[in-house]
């Protein structure tokens, strides 16, 4: 069922500028769960990864990475508390089944990923091998 939802979201996003989603649970600094309406009275829960950003891993390779990962997660929780309606733009399927990549636009119009990058809690990422967070 999850892959059907991802296909529906990817199809819809090609014809709609933004897909509204209701934030639910924040997993880490660049991934959260959200509810998306795919039909009247039909909402699905989908994992959303912020596009074009890399944040430290929660189970990182060193204490410094884990600390920064927690800071990034806490900041994303501040930006999109449970129940916040955000807009998902540029939706694409992710390498992990059941997850999508999207630009997440906050109620004030800012891009959540860009906020984290500007606050040094994440860095730009366009695919490929990621740089480490440990010195």
Predicted regions and their residues:
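Small beta-barrel nucleic-acid-binding modules, primarily SNase/OB-fold domains
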Residues: 2-5, 11-135
